Amino acid sequence: MLFKSLFVAAATAVGVSGHVAREAPRTFGCGTHEPSAEHVGMSKVLAAQEARVLESGNLTARATINVNVYFHVVAASQTVANGYLTDKMVTDQIAVLNRDFAPHDVAFRLAGTDRTVNTGWARDSNEIAMKRALRKGTYKDLNLYTQVSLTDNALGYAYFPTSGATSGSTTFIRDGVSIKAQTVPGGSQAGFNLGKTGTHEVGHWLGLYHTFQGGCTGSGDQVSDTPAQASFSSGCPIGRDSCPGQAGLDPIHNYMDYSDDSCYEEFTPGQDARIHSFWTTYRA
């Protein structure tokens, strides 16, 4: 089962002239797979550890997480309309990641950019073959792929950090983040062209779940300071309270909801701690 929107509008076709047509408004859709039982179990273990550290008051200075980014532009042709991003679009996306994650001591450095014209890969066909050909670096390096369209009409998807990611394994090869090229800053995806799809998916890559994970019952996204949420948000519904029996309004400004890019603002302190816990456990 995939984390994805149940209500996805059809995208407007891009003209063959190379002009970047504005895509029709739609609901955010994330294609990241549900976390495995192992991953949820580890989230619970880390949550307990984080709570003990907070209770003890034994808070030590932590190092900044420095992430090398290998940016893979995968296009259907050598036009922006077909996914061939400019250098500025690439660096602007990295700048968004740095701005959004800086308060949480995570920094991104563009280690390299490559461009590939392959119609099938640009439309998310044969993911493993594409990544086997393009992937670079180690398990702590972020491989970020931009493509023209993704499976199930998602705007992006990512792979959670996990055990067993030995060099050359399928887990290692497929690791990374894929986003629609139209979602980078200056892209054509209406409502989602400020680069925040990248932030959302990198959040998954660092171990975070959707804020609406689990709905109004149970332990939800396994982070104690994100209010319970019955379902994903759409747009920027100020004051939404989909779990009235639980404390707090829906976290519509949280990067791990499905709000419009202009609505996104934050990660919580609990998500901040979880990012660092998962990094230390699996990627450091």
Curated annotation (Swiss-Prot):
Family: Belongs to the peptidase M43B family.
Key words, A-Z: Disulfide bond, Glycoprotein, Hydrolase, Metal-binding, Metalloprotease, Protease, Secreted, Signal, Zinc
Gene3D superfamilies with a match to the protein in the record: Collagenase (Catalytic Domain)
Record GO biological process: proteolysis
UniProt protein name: Extracellular metalloprotease VDBG_01143
GO cellular component: extracellular region
Glycosylation sites per record: N58
PROSITE patterns: ZINC_PROTEASE
Active site: E201
PANTHER family: METALLOPROTEASE MEP1 (AFU_ORTHOLOGUE AFUA_1G07730)-RELATED, PTHR47466
Stretch forming the signal peptide: 1-18
Cysteines paired by S-S bonds: C236-C263
InterPro entries the record matches: MetalloPept_cat_dom_sf, Peptidase_M43
GO MF: metal ion binding; metallopeptidase activity
